[in-house]
């Protein structure tokens, strides 16, 4: 469609040129030459301006480089203000205050030398990207903000982040299929398939409490959960949060959740939560009150105004009976998963899991061994496999036979306390 129109235009121009006299064509040529000359002069002037601007930019970058020399003075943003000077304010030309005439954002900051400073000119950082509480690097002399610094966290909190993912798998856990399913539904699915919950209009649980006797696989389950998800994993221990100084434990909890927000999605695993989550009581001892303050900070982080649904909490304890009711209520640790002693079938599966890398004789009957290990937990069954291997090593055997496992059961049974009642 476009080709005939171009042909029509060119034929029209040819007809127009044919009808023009020689003088008209000469005049039109001169006009075009003048236009070309003017355009060339404009292009030359623009190139010169461009070169001068490049030179100025280079000079300014050199000045910025000189001003940005380390070390910086560290400061905190206290407040961000909007400056709107009145348009009708008239001042004498000799006494114009340029700072008062500026429009835009100004900053009040507090430096590490305990000085509070008002900055009408922010510096080299975009003012819209700043917010109160940000850590910034400022020039030692002019106090202009030169760079934003990463958030400050307690070094103990940074050490809680698990850098190397655990190698455990759900296949390493025997006899806890129901518990695995409940944990995956509450923690893993909301992170990997969030849209399924949104379709149903269901809010997933914020936290999970794993409880049961020692040695039943609570920590192992949390490690397997960390290995199966791509989320950041923070591991806290309850006794770690009990600190000597007042407010130190609460600050650790606050910093841990703040770090989790920055690295979201994130799973926070609190082992032995009964160290800080016991029922509240009247006490004259300041240490008890400090533990209660730490627990109150944990409650606030779980469902306070600043709670984040991308952060999931897994807590583990073997004393669920002494935990504070406020910690156990729905909306905080919504789902409670019990880890009982393994059944006979589960014991056989656990023995097979722990002996799968061992050179075991084909005649070993794991079902019979499971019947002989009544009231054994997962950790004790692992100890049985270790003892059986040590006995085979002692007699210079190349395979672990059924008698070695029986002897291992007897040895673990002898070391085990007569009563398995861990609660007073």
Curated annotation (Swiss-Prot):
It comes from the Eukaryota. There is a cross-link at residues 235, 279, 416 (Glycyl lysine isopeptide (Lys-Gly) (interchain with G-Cter in ubiquitin)). GO terms for molecular function: ATP binding; ATP hydrolysis activity. The modification Phosphoserine is found at residue 19. ATP binds at residues 212-219. GO terms for biological process: embryo sac development; pollen development; proteasomal protein catabolic process. Disruption phenotype: Displays a severe male gametophyte development defects in cv. Wassilewskija but not in cv. Columbia due to the complementation by RPT5B. Ubiquitous. GO terms for cellular component: cytoplasm; cytosol; nucleus; proteasome complex. The modification O-acetylthreonine is found at residue 278. Its main location: cytoplasm. Belongs to the AAA ATPase family. Component of the 19S regulatory particle (RP/PA700) base subcomplex of the 26S proteasome. The 26S proteasome is composed of a core protease (CP), known as the 20S proteasome, capped at one or both ends by the 19S regulatory particle (RP/PA700). The RP/PA700 complex is composed of at least 17 different subunits in two subcomplexes, the base and the lid, which form the portions proximal and distal to the 20S proteolytic core, respectively. This is 26S proteasome regulatory subunit 6A homolog A. It comes from Arabidopsis thaliana (Mouse-ear cress).
